[in-house]
Amino acid sequence: MFTVTPAKIYLNQEKTPVSEQFNDVYFSNQDGLAESEYVFQQGNHLWERWIVYQEKHFVIAETGFGTGLNFLAVTSLFRQFRQQYSHSPLKHLFFISFEKYPLPKVQLQQIHQFYPQFSALSQQLCDYCLEAIQGCQRFHFAETTLDLWFGDIVDNLPQLGDYMQNRIDAWFLDGFSPSKNPQMWNDELYQQMFYYSKPQGTFSTFTAASAVRKGLVSAGFEVQKRKGYGKKRECLCGIKNAIPQQNTKAPWYLSQPASLLSEDIAIIGGGIASLFTALSLLKRGAKITLYCEDEQLALNASGNKQGAFYPQLSDDDDRNIRFYVHAFFYALQQLQWAIKQGIEFEHEFCGVALCAYDHKSAVKLAKISSYQWSKSLYQNLNKEQLSEKIGLPLDCAGGFIPQGGWLAPRQFVQNTFSYLQQLGLEIKTSQKITALDYRNLQWVLTNEQNETFNHQVVVLANGYQITDFVQTAKLPLYPVRGQVSQIPTSANLLKLKSVLCYDGYLTPADKMKQSHCLGASHIRNNKDRHFSHQEQRENQQKIQQNLASTDTDKNMDWLQDIDISANIARIGVRCSVRDRVPIMGNVPHFEQQCLDYRNIFNLRRRKQPIPDAAQWKNLYLIGALGSRGLTSAALLGETLASLIYAEPLPLSEDILHNLSPNRSWIRKLLKGTEIK
């Protein structure tokens, strides 16, 4: 359901990889690299177009990633272009590629050995965690961003969605021979290529098959034949000579990029959502000012001493599972980046154990196991195996997430913000912004002292206080109080090797081997931050009751070492929403959407025109991360930065709809229910 089938290949006598699934070569026996350069780079006139290109980024989409040779070659070419034309407005290349049967990393490395000129790029690609999971995975290179979509292109290409209409500059129409892969080469593919292509967008392909040519012409492309590569007589290339048209399938969820003139952006917040949004925007060259109401950063929900880090692998909505899995791997990527930059923070990728401590949790974990995740993501273990993983005896089976673990959120957030200040981030603490007003193409921010600050774009990332403004007051967000207990370690508890999850969690000892974090209470609509003796006791009771053993031979004495008597705890107030899914994107204009969509149920039924969603111009938000901010914030911040800059988004359209800030209103309106 979520994993995809890996490729099965062999090398023929010419050392060319051959697919067993399609019984076809991945590229020419003659010279795969020369073929790639001739067919795709020259066929799309890339170098000539880049020289005169006036936008900040260029987008290439490829219909078959295969060995990654086209990606390596064009990334290398773009690097040469940036070195030769360093003052060009074109700064970045986006490469979107689809792959139904991904090659295992070992085989990629084996094939790339024949192209030593790409050794550094290949190493960087293979260093990333290329998990064969359905959907998009984003990987960063110096001047190039790779969005690699695993799964059938028939399913994934439509998930680029309405947002990507008229945004792709060039297509590498690649894949196995049309006669051997007819499921991909069809009219629907060509129509979607046309839909996503910019006016004057191009395509090129190695084939000259009549059915392909006719399909591309029928879709709207002007198609030309050119000399084929090597022994091939002809191949095709073409252009979209058409006026851009807007044909939106779900206008009520359509995201809108910012109108960027000066790239001057304000972020209101001070936690992990603000951090990753600032990081992604700074990498794009934005001028960022952060406004935090506290004297220090990370004093609220992002301020715990230790926090568990792992994906949510079970949910009634599969969109949420796909989102959290991709968010988890992207967060791992960003944490590794931080470590390489020398940013110090306590962490341990020691794995996370999920306990089947009662019937409900056992059913939940059985469902997770049924998805057949790779063992690098999830392992189903009996009680002996799970006990071995955590280093302490357990009387229950469960699951294990090997790449999960814990990190110190407050330390990570504060130290990474300090690093971002070196990149140009301006931080204003003790600045509570009380009002937002849009006038003269700028947002005017007013603080408690009635001082004002002007910025072109504003991002709200201030947790449950997002709703403090007139523009956001109707969003259905609420505060959730959480008390995390800090307990001393013991000879027994020092043996804990992995994060332990039940109806709560217990972390291994911190780096000083002095204490553990035991969490956490969950009190809705409560933003009180005073210590609670009751919640402290409940944190203790949950672990002792959930994991208590009925087996008298089982030595569970370590549970008695859970000592809360020192009454040390930290209280944070998280932000959540009823469906417990984050919100990210444009801030919706509530009153205007109520007016525009009051009759949307009948408009859809009659197939009448429906306007795009009314939104506050250049105002965005990221919030409701709940207790999973360590996992979700990095990908949400990256997606929001991409949206602001009108770049491709690293999430499928169905997930983006599920993250939309107006989703609760729209769901009611689409059913014919009035909202107030």
Curated annotation (Swiss-Prot):
* Cellular compartments annotated: Cytoplasm
Q: Which UniProt keywords apply?
A: Cytoplasm, FAD, Flavoprotein, Methyltransferase, Multifunctional enzyme, Oxidoreductase, S-adenosyl-L-methionine, Transferase, tRNA processing
Entry's Pfam families? Answer: DAO, Methyltransf_30
What organism does the record attribute this protein to? Histophilus somni (strain 2336)
Name the UniProt record assigns to this protein: tRNA 5-methylaminomethyl-2-thiouridine biosynthesis bifunctional protein MnmC
What PANTHER family does the annotation carry? Answer: SARCOSINE DEHYDROGENASE-RELATED (PTHR13847), TRNA 5-METHYLAMINOMETHYL-2-THIOURIDINE BIOSYNTHESIS BIFUNCTIONAL PROTEIN MNMC (PTHR13847:SF283)
What GO terms describe the biological role, i.e. biological process, of this protein? methylation; tRNA wobble uridine modification
What reaction gets catalysed by this protein? Answer: 5-aminomethyl-2-thiouridine(34) in tRNA + S-adenosyl-L-methionine = 5-methylaminomethyl-2-thiouridine(34) in tRNA + S-adenosyl-L-homocysteine + H(+)
- Give the main localization category: cytoplasm
Q: Where is this region: FAD-dependent cmnm(5)s(2)U34 oxidoreductase?
A: 268-676
Gene transcribed to yield this protein: mnmC
